[in-house]
């Protein structure tokens, strides 16, 4: 896989002190500037970029994607998070509902979970047969080769979290009214199937970690660090240049000559 330092992505090095907010925000600000440069380069060159994020529930996929996209244009950076397939979609070619979301020239598409649902949740929760899983594992590398040959820059990230940290985060979702929406009935059903998900992950890596689209594993025990590490890594995987920016100045404008309206504006209560 992308990082060969450890054969076991759960294997964690010595404990590192959590990154404080000030250091995190400073580093993230610099990376956001680089993402804006990348954005302009992708449009300028007509590049097609697709980034896949996978990992267990609570691994930090959503927070990482938000950190990537919060300072760029949603017209260029497009996030795809598909719901469960409809009955019609279930009757289609498995990859079909994902293919229509792939990037056109000048776009960066980020999948918050992807076609790899078949290798993970669908396999573990019994939503597909073992034969369908194997067919997917055999076919995914060829589909991805086709994407690359069509000119798509495809990056695949797996966020790895320990069972202890996952449990802490899921309990936090239960206790925090701002996060309870993140906890689905499927998350609860999946909670006791850690080993099954581990086996599914290992089979997925073995079958789909290819020379043309390898898997990159990011340890996500520290949410702040994994966001910075992933953004830094993806910037290193897409060659780009800083395009010249024309200086911008605001023109002079005239205000005050228009007669003020008597319209009774309905202002909202100012409680803060």
Q: What are these regions, as identified by a protein language model?
A:
Residues 1-272:
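Glycine-rich phosphate-binding loop of ATP-dependent small-molecule kinases
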